[in-house]
């Protein structure tokens, strides 16, 4: 199935790490078994977020994928940014600082050079839309993500981001 107007194709079902890896399931063998069944069943899309078990979801799921020896180019990996990762005032939201620092930490935890999709996990009313769009555009242009998108944004918020990106020569969600 095609993702939006991009050329990226994903399985109809994805395997996500929310409330699972690092929380209800912590045993790496069990995680590897789940990931193996998913991959053998045709799932190529593996979804995460930095805040899932404070980074453990990213670590454990991708460790299982590495252990299974699935070539990176056969996978579609995503992660998200927004929620607090610590008590630090800047370690949350969609500021340029948080977006750029979080992608690097996610890539390190996931043991990969890039994610296929990097999502704004929620809308951040405290950050100017231009800052958000420019930061995500920079992540894509730097090769750390191939696409960026949104999660739980309104249609109006997405339309604003797309219009701003087009008007500014930036990468749109």
Model-identified regions with their sequence ranges:
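N-terminal binding-site loop/beta-alpha segment at the start of enzyme catalytic domains
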Residues: 1-76, 113, 141
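Short, flexible active-site-adjacent loop segments at beta-strand->alpha-helix junctions, enriched
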Residues: 14, 19, 81-83, 124, ...
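Conserved beta-strand positions
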Residues: 15, 48, 79, 117-120, ...
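Generic beta-strand or strand-like secondary-structure segments
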Residues: 60-64, 76, 80, 98-105, ...
